[in-house]
From Swiss-Prot:
Protein's recorded name: Short-chain dehydrogenase reductase 2a
Pfam families, per database record: adh_short_C2
EC number: 1.1.1.-
Active site residues according to the UniProt entry: Y190
Keywords of this entry: Oxidoreductase
Gene: SDR2a
Source species: Arabidopsis thaliana
GO molecular function list: oxidoreductase activity
Family designation: Belongs to the short-chain dehydrogenases/reductases (SDR) family.
Binding site for NAD(+): 38-62
Binding site for substrate: S177
The UniProt record lists the keyword Oxidoreductase: yes
PANTHER family: 3-OXOACYL-(ACYL-CARRIER-PROTEIN) REDUCTASE (AFU_ORTHOLOGUE AFUA_6G11210), SHORT-CHAIN DEHYDROGENASE REDUCTASE 2A
Catalytic EC class: oxidoreductase
Superkingdom of the source species: Eukaryota
Length: 303
């Protein structure tokens, strides 16, 4: 190859690399700069990962959780960094309407706006009480639906009211599950609740689109969060141990269609970041499935 061509190609790649570096660090340094976000279930797992990622991208973040100790500690830790935006904690049980209304009202009163509401709080339910439909436990079913579905509905209600009242074209995101896409992926109550979240998302998107409010949800495959690991450990008996996370991840990998990768909480946080940012400005009523293709592959005959 002529030296001139090699030199021109080298120059092109150098310029290209420089442009990409400047794009990443200068033009788009923070994708949520100036925005205010509420993240329920923000003290642990997917919620915690999202709190940290949103804060890193310039958002003012309000952590909402029933775990006051973990929530307060996380907020204090993130707010201690000089370059970080404000991160606050508000105690909230998403199944209690007064708590959800207070969460939204305090956030708006304190920061003047609400741009992003991430309905992430949820429960898996008692595995032993939901092992078989023949042993259906109505009280346990009501508990799961109260937190997972009622909590999302209340979040949508009060979050949308605040956005509409102040004319903000915000976005509402909810955590669903692959169990809300197909059967046989989780306990009965949990599966019913996640199907309901997908339905609520689509219906709310149809109604709120006229206000410029986008409503979407995320359906992850198995993520080895404390909730999932605890449920798995309780089913087999005993307390959670340090190596249970790795063991759980290995189990999920064995079921996965996409090999060579491990789904972690930060991957779901990245999906939430996309849906919360202006990059998804025309995405509405969508269930973003983050499962490495498992729900597609399991529906394929003979593959």
């Amino acid at each position: 190859m002529p030296a001139q061509v090699i030199a021109e190609q080298t120059t092109f790649h150098s310029v290209h690399d420089t442009i990409m570096e400047e794009t990443n660090t200068t033009l788009y340094p923070k994708r949520l700069e100036g925005k205010v976000a509420i993240i329920t279930g923000g003290a642990h797992g997917i919620g915690k990962a999202t709190v940290m990622l949103f804060a890193r991208h310039g958002a003012t973040v309000v952590i909402a959780d029933v775990d006051n100790v973990a929530g307060s500690s996380l907020a204090k830790s993130l707010s201690s960094h000089k370059t970080s935006p404000m991160v606050a904690f508000i105690s909230c049980d998403v199944s209690v309407e007064a708590d959800v209304e207070n969460l939204v009202n305090v956030t708006v009163a304190r920061y003047g706006r609400l741009d992003i509401l991430f309905n992430n709080a949820g429960v898996l339910g008692d595995q032993k009480k939901h092992k078989s439909i023949l042993d259906f436990d109505a009280d346990e079913f009501d508990h799961v639906m109260r937190v997972n579905v009622r909590g999302v509905g209340l979040g949508m209600k009060h979050g949308a009211r605040a956005m509409i009242k102040r004319g903000f074209k915000g976005c509402i995101i909810s955590t669903a599950s692959v169990a809300g896409v197909m059967g046989g992926m989780g306990p009965h109550a949990y599966t019913a609740s996640k199907h309901a979240i997908v339905g609520l998302t689509k219906n709310a998107a149809c109604e709120l689109g006229k206000y410029g409010i986008r409503v979407n949800c995320i359906s992850p495959f198995g993520v080895a969060t404390s909730m999932l690991v605890n449920a798995w450990r309780k089913t087999s008996g005993g307390d959670v141990e340090d190596d249970d996370v790795e063991e759980m991840e290995e189990f999920v990998r064995s079921l996965a269609n996409l090999k060579g990768e491990t789904l972690r909480a930060n991957d779901i946080a990245e999906a939430a970041l996309y849906l919360a940012s202006d990059e998804s400005k025309y995405v509405n009523g969508h269930n973003l499935v983050v499962d490495g293709g498992v729900t597609t592959a399991r529906n394929c005959v003979g593959l």
